[in-house]
Amino acid sequence: VSLYYSDLEPRFYASIAYSGRVWECLTATEDANRDLSVFFYKDSENGQDLMNRELYHWTGIGVCKYVHPDDALTVGGSLKHKIEPTIRYADVLLWYAEALNEIEDGATYSFPSYNNQGVITVSRNTSQMSEAFRQVRFRAGLPDLSQQVYNDRNSFRRALKRERQIELFLESARY
């Protein structure tokens, strides 16, 4: 495998099918059809469309985000049903961090709680922004952003946009 694909963010390996990637294919009935290294280029049979041998990954990359390790398209193999969530908790956390970031400095808003048992007060609070944003990064095995990024509204807005693009890749999300 090319060193080009080494030492990248963990979500890359979970989402992108690159040339040389190993496909586990755990439901394949023959050992030879499991743990396959697949290379995408014109003269390789890997990655070609079975209906049209001229169709293949021209760029050398594809998508593996929704591929389960058990999935195998070989004789005796099977595909796992995937549950596609309507809304992800990671998206809710990113919305929350974004909403806090967009509150003007010094502004405070109060509104009744969902059960009318109290009042919720919100303001641009970088520790709350970090708490929400950090959960998304930690789940992916990534470190938190620096406090400087949280303190600067525009820097955090850029970081948030990039995080949303990577975390919600191929999930019909808009940025």
Where are these regions (language model features)?
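Acidic/polar-rich alpha-helix caps and helix-coil junctions
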Residues: 1-175
